[in-house]
Amino acid sequence: MKRIFSIIITYTLLIFLMGGVGLITSSCTPEDQPGQQPGTEEPGGEEETPTVPGAPAAFSKFISTISKGENLDIPLQGEWNLLYKGFKAGDKITITMVNDASVTFTLTCTKADDETGAFFTIPTKFIGGNCKVVAEAGGRTTTGTCFVNIVDNFEVEKKSGYTTYGRVVDYDGNPVSGVTVSDGALVTKTDANGCYYLRSEKKNLFVFISTPKNYKVSIDRAVPQFFHRFKSTKSSIYELHNFVLAPEENTKHRLLVWSDTHLANRTDDKNQFKKYFKPDIEAEITKAKSEGVKLYAIGLGDLAWDEYWYKNDYSLKNYRADISDFDLTIYSSPGNHDNDPTIADDFLAAAGFRENLNPLYYSFNIGDIHYIMMDNTLFSNTGGNNVQDYKEGFTDDQMKWLKGDLANVQKGSTIIFGLHIPWTNRSQANGTFTYAMPATQRSEVESLLSDFKVHFISGHTHTNYTNVMNSKMMEHNIAGVCGTWWWTGYYSKNKCRLNGDGTPAGYKIFDINASDVKWQYKVMARDASYQFRAYDLRNSLITRDLYCPAKDNSKVSDAFFSEYANGYDKAANTTSTKKVLINVFDYDQDWKVEVTENGTKLSVNRIDGKDPLHTIHFNMGRMNSNSTSMTFPTGGTAHMFEVSTSQTTSSVVIKVTDRFGRVYEETMTRPRKLYDMSKEDKW
């Protein structure tokens, strides 16, 4: 009888050590998984060193954990064993979601002693997140904000040679089958019991899931937790990694896409980001909640600026902190400036991105849309001394992963394919364009995508354009949040932020219902109806005395000034003309631009031109500081339109209709001055 009792006690303690689950191993059948080559079974790997609970720590350490906001790991099932002294039965810990006070749980201590610690009840139907934590214990109340991580400690049965394994379940412990799981090279799917197995070499440092339709993962300071970092880089060591999901109806959803924030603690960038970008995003969050629409976001790279990671002590860690208060799920992809400038190796230089954000490439599903996030910067940084040279392309592992991922996507689906460097170059006025991606990989990827409808989304250029490649594929190259690296805001005293093509700084909003996708460019700090800007060219003369008047600009020759005035210093192009110039920020081939003068419809010509306002607020601003460093001068764009009027002072009605039938209209009264926005705020 004593022996039987001893066995029962031992078995009970083992259950507690495993996180309080009712079964020790799963009923998963460790067969070769779909999407992964079975091959010859490898010899068994090394056992992962088990974590053995030590003696309970002092109560003061628990107080420190809460007050410092450190992570709290709470088991999915059973009881929560807190290995601290000083608790007593009846003590309470209340956790409340920071951004949703209606989600709150009071966890009660059921028993406690200084030998085994305290045992608390656990929350139900909860996957964790950023929470306010209030602990009423030890005769005191302690408050902090922590990421609460719901951990599934369920022991999935091992299979020899498959050293990365685990399961995917919902917050009730029910298995979720058919979920794509990968280590960044191999791809598999969960079986009927929610289990997966990978023969991982662990060289990409993560195991991650492609979050399935109508589910969500927990969010840690705006970053979705769809991944686990390997504990060891030794491929021979077995590692168990389980994932917990919550159901979420998201067939209808909204997506915010931004790129090129380029925060670097210079040119007043942090203030501009805080004053203009963040309130805009907060307004979108509030709007989506009021409409009952699920909202997500994607950041397409160049989120910080590698050159200033060390010079100005602002890196991706700081960027993460600056977005951490958004009540938003933000997926990120790396840009060429998101690499360590002291490291001459593509993979190693991206360590900061992986550490602070997420894997370099991955996929997820929201509603009927399959999202793919890619890393198309092959970073060389020759010599490791801030050279920052790179080329466009994908690693072999990334291509291997992409093939495996797409094999699990239903043909005919809509894919949003995110990357930093664009797939295509901007179009010319006649609508033609060339490709930016190298031909070999471009051809291979487009072949893989040929059975799907694809929207490429990209950044990098600090310009705005949309190219329709064929009936199934198009690209949205999205202007930068920073505009011209925050300089135009700096020069204009925060009255305008412009990209090199004259597009105001902003982001793109996609409204999605099942496979129906609509979009609209949104200018920061302006109403969504602000979609174009019109110039009275007769009053757009740019002169040195008006726009470059500083006495100390001796470096700027008249010839240099004229070169970067972009023709607007010529009277023949300005004061003697009757033309109107219109910059339509998000124009594509299915938009219409119409202009009438006194009821008469005028001929509208699409041209390749340069924006006058950007010419003033970067080119002139730079020269006015006695600098000839034209690092980001005004660039050409083909979303520019020119109209010849019959009179010089007549009003004209400009009507722009986008591809979805939304109409943007302005009655332009002339003469209209070319405003210097550092002095007058008109646009």
Please give the residue ranges for each predicted region.
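Ser/Thr/Pro-rich low-complexity tracts
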Residues: 35, 52-153
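Metal-dependent phosphoesterase/phosphodiesterase active-site architecture
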Residues: 155-164, 220-237, 259, 281-287, ...
